[in-house]
Amino acid sequence: MARKKIALVGAGQIGGTLALLAGQKELGDIVLLDIPDAEGVAKGKALDIAEASPVEGFDAGYTGTSNYADLAGADVVIVTAGVPRKPGMSRDDLVGINARIIKAVGEGIRTHAPDAFVIVITNPLDAMVGLMQQVTGFDPAKVVGMAGVLDSARFRWFLAEEFKVSVEDVTAFVLGGHGDTMVPSVRYSTVAGIPLPDLVKMGWTTQEKLDQIVQRTRDGGAEIVGLLKTGSAFYAPAASAIAMAESYLKDKKRVMPCAARLTGQYGVDGLYIGVPVVIGAGGVEKIVEIELNAEEQAMFDKSVAAVKSLVEVTAKVAG
């Protein structure tokens, strides 16, 4: 059976990490693409990782390029191309320049990889994934945004740290836009099946501490930006996107929070927003509509409003 093909658009920190993880998991052959001025970076990283494969013990072909024709036949395309956040910069500040980049990338994908499952990482995420779907014209089930898996992973890590338990036993969901208005769901998050509110009653933690963890989750990206000072997170975002790609390529049908296009679910129509979905061979095969209480719904609505305004700004900038 022929190997699958994974195309990575953007050979920066996330792109390089994606290339390594995809190879280590033997998901397929990898194409690392960047702009002509950075073609050497794409080729250099591809060669460097290929040379690591005999040591690590995995088989994968690696190609570095600046030519979109090399995306031909890609099963998955993961898009990281764009300008990273700098300290003091909000995700929204990135709209203008990244919208132009996404338009160019989307046209390349539409022409050369029309059957691909597209995962967008570029910020501001919810607006960029919507723009990608518009530019490609792909079925919305085949265009998805990586945000919720990352935000939930951060939430899970903070909770595991607080409870001093394995991250594997912590399940957590983050809904809404990938930004300051995201909604980490305390009610639907558990440790070994025990909901967080019950753990508060059991004396494992306090509501105040949980509130602090929720806020730290919202600020998770900015915390990393502030520490690195030279860019934004790349290990956890790459791991999150690879988990999504693997679920698609292997038809695992994992339930993951992702930015998906809603068609009436949660009272939202025609907008990409973070919700739990099932990812399988058909792409986004199902949107899981969980019941929200009044407080959660209010926070979710606020997040949706923030995404809507961002989409409007993007539409003006992108023309």
UniProtKB/Swiss-Prot annotation:
This enzyme's EC code(s): 1.1.1.37
Catalytic activity annotation: (S)-malate + NAD(+) = oxaloacetate + NADH + H(+)
A Pfam short name: Ldh_1_C
GO biological process, one term: tricarboxylic acid cycle
Keyword set, alphabetical order: NAD, Oxidoreductase, Tricarboxylic acid cycle
Active site: 178 (proton acceptor)
UniProt cross-references to SUPFAM superfamilies, sorted A to Z: LDH C-terminal domain-like (SSF56327), NAD(P)-binding Rossmann-fold domains (SSF51735)
GO MF entry, a single one: L-malate dehydrogenase (NAD+) activity
NCBIfam families noted in UniProt: MalateDH_bact, PRK06223.1
One GO CC term on file: cytoplasm
Binding of substrate, residues: 85, 91, 123, 154
Free-text function comment from the UniProt entry: Catalyzes the reversible oxidation of malate to oxaloacetate.
Protein name (Swiss-Prot/TrEMBL): Malate dehydrogenase
InterPro entries for this protein: L-lactate/malate_DH, Lactate/malate_DH_C, Lactate/malate_DH_N, Lactate_DH/Glyco_Ohase_4_C, Malate_DH_type3, NAD(P)-bd_dom_sf
Binding site for NAD(+): 10-15, 34, 98, 121-123
Family: Belongs to the LDH/MDH superfamily. MDH type 3 family.
